[in-house]
């Protein structure tokens, strides 16, 4: 369970922002969304494989030299 201590004279907005940032760092929302519905193991493997391919091509594209514009 994630908790934050609200400091004295701290606005609610700031405390809420700190809480959201903590939740984001822990990855709780992404984990919760992933577990919201059952995903078959084959579908999960397929999704992860597609994400890995996408990351690979993105890395390759970033390493290429830019085309010269004449």
UniProtKB/Swiss-Prot annotation:
The keyword RNA-binding does not apply. Pfam families: Ribosomal_S21. Gene3D superfamilies: Ribosomal protein S8. One of its GO terms (molecular function) is structural constituent of ribosome. Signal peptide: none annotated. One of its GO terms (cellular component) is ribonucleoprotein complex. GO terms for biological process: translation. InterPro entries: Ribosomal_bS21, Ribosomal_bS21_CS, Ribosomal_bS21_sf. Keywords: Ribonucleoprotein, Ribosomal protein. NCBIfam families: S21p (TIGR00030). HAMAP family: Ribosomal_bS21. PANTHER family: MITOCHONDRIAL 28S RIBOSOMAL PROTEIN S21 (PTHR21109), SMALL RIBOSOMAL SUBUNIT PROTEIN BS21 (PTHR21109:SF22). Belongs to the bacterial ribosomal protein bS21 family. This is Small ribosomal subunit protein bS21. It comes from Verminephrobacter eiseniae (strain EF01-2). The gene is rpsU.
């Amino acid at each position: 369970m994630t908790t934050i201590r609200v400091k004295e004279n701290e606005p609610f907005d700031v405390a809420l922002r700190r809480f959201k940032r903590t939740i984001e760092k822990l990855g709780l929302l992404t984990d919760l969304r992933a577990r919201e519905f059952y995903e078959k193991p084959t579908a999960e493997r397929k999704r992860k494989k597609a994400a890995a391919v996408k990351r690979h091509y993105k890395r390759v594209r970033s390493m290429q030299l830019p085309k010269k514009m004449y």
